[in-house]
Every structure is written in C-alpha cells, then in structure tokens.
Swiss-Prot record:
PROSITE patterns: LIPASE_GDXG_HIS, LIPASE_GDXG_SER. Belongs to the 'GDXG' lipolytic enzyme family. Phosphorylation by AMPK reduces its translocation towards the lipid droplets. Pfam families: Abhydrolase_3, HSL_N. Residues 581-596 have a biased composition (Polar residues). Keywords: Cell membrane, Cholesterol metabolism, Cytoplasm, Hydrolase, Lipid degradation, Lipid droplet, Lipid metabolism, Membrane, Phosphoprotein, Steroid metabolism, Sterol metabolism. Disulfide bonds: none annotated. This is Hormone-sensitive lipase. Residues 542-570, 581-600 are annotated as: Disordered. GO terms for molecular function: all-trans-retinyl-palmitate hydrolase, all-trans-retinol forming activity; diacylglycerol lipase activity; monoacylglycerol lipase activity; retinyl-palmitate esterase activity; rRNA primary transcript binding; sterol ester esterase activity; triacylglycerol lipase activity. It comes from the Eukaryota. Monomer and homodimer. Interacts with CAVIN1 in the adipocyte cytoplasm. Interacts with PLIN5. One of its GO terms (cellular component) is caveola.
Length: 756
C-alpha cells in the first residue's frame, strides 16, 4: 500500500471512530477516544506531505540503484510502520467498539502511545527537511558552521523519547526481535535503578527480580525511566550494562549454546618491538613499536579461535603466549590430531562503543565463523575508554594485526589471504588499522568486512542519526558520551569511594539490608500492580518520591478526574501535549518554539540554520528534484503553525558536543580522511542496517570510496537493529544478516561457497 493510500485509509477510519465515540455521551473515556482519533487524523494529514517530499529525493543519496538505502529512506520507512500499526489498530477498534469484550483502557493506552510516536516522527520528518535544504547536494552529513550544528543537536535532544521505549518499543523492527528488545529494555531500567546504590552483583540481580516487575507491567513507566537513564547516567553505567555478558555465568551459558571449537585460547602479546618487511621492498624493514599511548608499554590480549586444531596452534612458542582461563586451557591436550594450516586468516576487532565488551562477548558468532570459513580467527581485546582513550585502542589493534601477519604460522595459517573484520566501533578500527598499515608501508589486509561501522565520530547531524531518538541501543546522548570518552574528554569519576570506605563486610551488611527492603517493597509493588490490573482500586496513602508506586495508564488515565490530569504527566498523553489545543494552555515549562518570531531576525553576520546557503553557487548545483519551494522551506517556522512536538519532561539535558580537532582526525573519523589515504584501502565490504542510526556512516563512506574508484560493496539488512551479529541465533532474519557477513568474508578470502 502506497503512502497516500495508507494515509487516506487511516484518516477515513479515524473520522469514523471520531463520529462514533463523540456520540457516546460526555464521559471521560469517550472524550479521550474522540480526541485521540482527532489527533491521529491531524498528524497523519500533516505527516504525509513531508514524507512524500523526502521520498521524492531520497534516491539522490543512494550508493547506486541496486542499493536503495540512506537515512531519508529509513525515516520514511519508520513512519510508515507507525502509520501501518495505527491503521491496523483503528480497523480493530472500528470492528470491535460495540463488543462487550472491547478492552477500552488497553486500546486507548496503545492509541495514545502510538499517537505520541507519530507526532514525534512528524517532527523528525521536518528536521530531515531542514537537513535536506541545508546540506550540500548529495551529502548526508551536515558540513558547516559548528555553532549551527550544535544548536540543531541541542534542540533535537529536547524531544520526548519515552513513548518509543514503552508500548511502541521496537515497532519498526522485525516482529521476531521485539520480545528480546522488550527484555533488554526491562533489564536496562532495572539495572539503572540499582546502579547508583553501589550494590554488588547478587544484590542487583535480586533487587531487580523482586522490585522491578512493575517495568514489565507498566510500559509507560518503563519508557519514562528509560528516557531518564539515557539522559542522566554517565558512560560508566553503559559500560557496566553492556559488560553484563562478560559475567561468568552468562558467558558459560552462551558458550553452551554456541558452536563447539577445538581451539579458543586467550593470548597475551608482550610489548616487544619487532621488524616487518616493506611491501615495496621486502629486503627493507620497518620497526613496529608496542602500544605506548597514555599508559606506556603493555601487553595486548588476543583470542585465537579455530574450529580445527591446526599446525602451529599447539606449538611451544604459541603456548608461551597463552593466558590461562581455567579448564578451557586443557582443551588442546585432549585433541592431538592436527589439520594442515589454512590459507586464510581472519583478524577480528569487536565493537562496543570503544568503552565496553571483549572478544568473549562476541565469541558465539566467531565460533560459527570459524566453522563456516574453515579458517582461524584472531580477535583483538583492545584496551577500552575511559581508562584508555584514543589512540590506545588503535595502537593495540595495529600492533596485534602486524604480529598476526608476522606470526600467522603459529596461528594455523599460511597467511596467503588475510581479512580484517569488525562491527560498529570495531569496523572503525578496521579502517584505521588498514590506513596505518599503508602509511607504515607494511602489508595491508586483502579486504575489510565492516558490519554497521562508525566512520564519522564528529558531532554532526544526518537523517539516519535522527533515528537515535527511538533506538534502544544507540540514543544520541549515549553515542555522544561514548565518542567523547574515546576522544579523551574529562568524565565524571566513578563513585566507588563509598565501597572503599565500607569494606567487604560493610558491603555485605548493606546489601543484605537493601535486599530485605527490596523484598518488602517488591511484594507490595507486585501486589498493587496485579490488583490494579484486576480492576480493583488501591489508594496509596504514602509513597516514597524516590521509588514511586505508579498506577498503570490503563486504569489511572480513565479513573482520574479530568482536572487532576497535569499537562506534563508521563502517564497520560493528553491531547494538548500533542498539539491539538491552542498554545494558550498553561504548562509547567514553556514550549520550545523554533519559529522566526521566537528566534528573532537574523543579523547578516549570524548563521541561521533555517535558511539555505547564502552563496547561490552551492544551491545552483542541486538537482532539479530539490526545487525552490523545498530550498526555502526553512525561511519561515521550523514547524507548521499549530504543530508542537512533545518535549522532554526531564528538563534541559547537557550533551557534550565535541568539535575538537581530534575527532576530525582520520584515525578517528575515517570518513574525513583525504582521498590519498582512502585510495590505500583494500577492497571494502560493508554490511549495514537500514534502521541503524549509523546507516549514513556506511552509505557516505561507500560513496566516497566509489567516487575514488576503490572497490567497495554495500549490503543493507532490513528491519534489524544495530548489533545484529550478537543476536545471530535469535531469529531467521538475524541469521540471514550474519550469513551475509560470512559471505563477504568468504569473498575476501577467495574461499569456496558453502555446500548446498
């Protein structure tokens, strides 16, 4: 169904439902249902033209006709998913509204949540139009005055996000992955609630189990808490949460479910300089020094994974590098039979935002790769920020890569074909390691496979970056915190002083007291939640402000008197919050308006983001599809008159926007590398996600390489989130996307295809 037909069908159903519920009397339920369908009608009619304009020019930003992918397309697709859900729900309401089994409160809550999401998506469409009229032709990232982009990003982060993490969580992704995303979001908000208490692992687990069931029962509460976490908690929280998979129990369970391999050994490479031959003249050598940045010389940890035990992998020389991991170190001694060395070698660099995870986190899919490719894999455990900011990780990865090239025989490979592979931050490091290898004059890999890589670390805007408003893994504030930490910016000290003061016994006593308290409060929370779901009213006379016992929106929104519903309520999406009332409604905080009247007239020396380039030569090069009407759209208000997106109730959020020269360094942002550097890269194969906030990183990097005549391919996985490699075993769609990565590596290594 095309966009216009979908919109017209939704508007027709909304008007029919409005007419029905407006005739049901003056009750609160009927009034709210009438209002929500009025809001759906208004937002759908306003959104359709904006999406149409984006879609009409989206093809100008594709890599080629065979790869229709960029942030504009992704934004339109996401809005279509929201419209499709509202269309389905509106049809359901129209068919069942007279039934005695019609769940009024549930359907109202879901309609309100998706109306809020549709309103925010409409705002994103207008932001995308502003980028379209301001960016240079064919460019997805904004390039210009840094003050302008800072103002744009600070304005963007004030948008309300909680609606995307409650009932609407993951609506844009494939249905098979949504239950997993819900589990992750519940775990994140539970983890966040106990994070600041400095609790030990057992206390966090027990507290989350008994007290945080309300996050599963109440989607609106979960969304509000998720929004609070992504705005207020520092990078140490995200580092701790993303490293949960490193816990021994969880990693053991993952290993039990993954492919069994003969070799999985952690190696420690000593910080010793060695010589490497130059590719231009093998008789000449260059010295590869050990990593030195920030902490001085130190060992580099790597993990060798091989499905078969191959020659060299049980040698005494390699064993001297082995770092014991317990029983797994005995695995080789039980299997003395050896296979010949493989022609191929894969050097892998894991992702994790430069701040989290290790090769152990990525071991499950690496084992599958080792089996499918029949080649050993060396995964690098580089040092993480904030303890080891840029360029420590790059130095360690380059050192480990050179060591692997020089000692490939010990790793079970002849080294005829070498592939660099990585995901996310690891993809970034794959590019920069190869650039450094070319600069040193040593052997570059035969190809690079980068899954959803980060190629632009500078704080800037692009259409796909707008998707971070609803992304569960890569909210813009989290991206900014990770990048600033990797760049070496000052971060808040991790609050561990209390733990040091208490000591071991003090921690045990404190955690015991907290656990008993949480058991007591948790039982009360669960009981009240289930009583409310059963329709019984419970009046809490005394509720702690730090741990509120909130009622679900399904009951509270329908039983609360009209006058007591605050305009800033997180539990009920009032119609005036969605821009359906005039601006005379009072609010606790003023609406942020980007109209010309609010911003005031621009002085000649002031750069106005809402205006196109004053230099007509730039815009004269734009394709005909970008007509004059689109170019001057920003001269008036940022949004149409009467439209006001929801703003964040958490107050103004501080987000570091780093534009220091270091983030423009090609070793941090390879997209900004000069042509002469990019021309030294080997064939590049990128596998991206259509709904990833970093999609434009992949598209623009591929476009740059293609423009230089460099061999590059781009494959885009549909309907999947960033990080799908770690979810490879979850569903058919993630398995297919992971198989696409393996197929790209196989192409680099010149390996035969898998048996049919």
């Amino acid at each position: 169904m095309d966009l216009r037909t979908m919109t017209q069908s939704l508007v027709t159903l909304a008007e029919d439902n409005m007419a029905f519920f407006s005739s049901q009397g003056p009750g609160e339920t009927a009034r709210r249902l009438t209002g929500v369908f009025a809001g759906i009608r208004e937002q759908a009619l306003g959104l359709e033209p904006a999406l149409g304009r984006l879609l009409s020019v989206a093809h100008l930003f594709d890599l080629d006709t065979e790869t229709p992918a960029n942030g504009y397309r992704s934004l339109v697709h996401t809005a279509r998913c929201c419209l499709a859900h509202l269309l389905h729900k509106s049809r359901y309401v129209a068919s069942n509204r007279r039934s005695i089994f019609f769940r009024t409160s549930h359907n109202l809550a879901e309609l309100e949540a998706y109306l809020a999401a549709l309103t925010q998506l409409r705002a994103l469409a207008y932001y995308a139009q502003r980028l379209l009229t301001t960016n240079q032709p064919g460019r997805l990232f904004f390039e210009g005055d840094e003050r302008v982009i800072a103002d744009f990003l600070r304005e963007y982060v004030t948008l309300h996000k909680g609606c995307f993490y409650g009932r609407c969580l993951g609506f844009q992704f494939t249905p098979a992955i949504r239950p997993f995303l819900q589990t992750i979001s519940i775990g994140l908000v539970s983890f966040g609630e106990h994070y600041k208490r400095n609790e030990t692992g057992i206390s966090v687990t027990a507290s989350s189990l008994f007290t945080d069931g309300r996050f599963a029962i109440d989607p609106e509460l979960r969304g509000a808490e998720f929004e609070r976490i992504i705005q207020n908690l520092d990078v140490h929280f995200w580092k701790a949460f993303w490293n949960i998979t490193e816990i021994q129990v969880l990693s053991s369970l993952a290993n039990m479910a993954s492919t069994t391999v003969r070799v999985s050994r952690l190696l420690s490479l000593p910080p010793v300089a060695f010589e490497m031959p130059l590719t231009s003249d093998p008789e000449l050598t260059v010295t590869i020094s050990p990593p030195l940045a920030h902490t001085g010389p130190g060992p580099v940890l790597v993990r060798l994974i091989s499905y078969d035990l191959r020659e060299g992998q049980d040698s005494k020389e390699l064993s001297s590098f082995v770092r014991s991991e317990g029983p797994r170190s005995l695995e080789l001694r039980l299997r003395p039979q050896q296979a010949p060395r493989s022609r191929a070698l894969v050097v892998h660099i894991h992702g994790g935002g430069f701040v989290a995870q290790t090769s152990k986190s990525h071991e499950p899919y690496l084992k599958s790769w080792a089996q499918e490719l029949g080649a050993p894999i060396l995964s690098i455990d580089y040092s993480l920020a904030p303890e080891a900011p840029f360029p420590r990780a790059l130095e360690e990865c380059f050192y480990a890569y050179c060591w692997a090239v020089k000692h490939c025989a010990l790793l079970g490979s002849t080294g005829e074909r070498i592939c660099l592979a990585g995901d996310s931050a690891g993809g970034n490091l794959c590019f920069t390691v190869s650039l450094r290898a070319a600069a040193y004059g040593v052997r570059v890999p035969d190809g690079i496979m980068a899954a959803y890589p980060a190629t632009m670390l500078q704080s800037t805007a692009s259409p796909s970056r707008l998707l971070s408003l609803m992304d569960h893994l890569l909210p813009l504030s989290v991206l900014s915190k990770c990048v600033s930490t990797y760049a070496g910016a000052e971060t808040e000290d991790h609050p561990d002083s209390d733990q040091k003061a208490l000591g071991v016994m003090g921690l045990v006593q404190r955690d015991t007291a907290l656990l008993l308290r949480d058991l007591r409060l948790g039982a009360s929370s669960w009981l009240n939640s289930f009583l409310e779901l059963g329709g019984q009213k419970s009046h809490l006379k005394s509720v702690s402000k730090t741990e509120p016992m909130r009622r679900s929106v399904s009951e509270a929104a329908l039983t609360q008197p009209e006058g007591s519903l605050g305009t800033d309520s997180l539990k009920s999406l009032k119609l005036h919050d969605l821009g359906l009332r005039n601006s005379s409604d009072t609010t606790d905080t003023p609406e942020l308006s980007l109209s010309a009247e609010t911003l005031g007239p621009s002085a000649p020396s002031t750069i106005n983001f809402l205006l196109g380039s004053e230099d007509g030569s730039e815009m004269s090069k734009a394709p005909e599809e970008l007509n004059n009407k689109d170019r001057v759209r920003g001269v008036g208000a940022a949004f149409p008159e009467g439209f006001h997106p929801r703003r964040c109730s958490q107050g103004a959020m501080w987000m570091p926007l780093y534009s220091a020269p270091i983030v423009k360094n090609p070793s941090m942002s390879p997209l900004l590398a000069p042509d002469s550097m990019l021309q030294t890269l080997p064939p590049v194969h990128i596998v991206a996600c259509a709904l990833d906030p970093m999609l434009d990183d992949s598209v623009m990097f591929a476009r740059r390489l293609r423009g230089l005549g460099q061999p590059v391919t781009l494959r885009v996985a549909e309907d999947l989130p960033h990080g799908f490699l770690s979810l490879a075993a979850l569903c058919r769609e993630t398995r297919q996307a992971a198989a696409l990565c393996v197929e790209r590596i196989r192409l680099i290594l010149n390996l035969p295809g898998p048996p049919v």
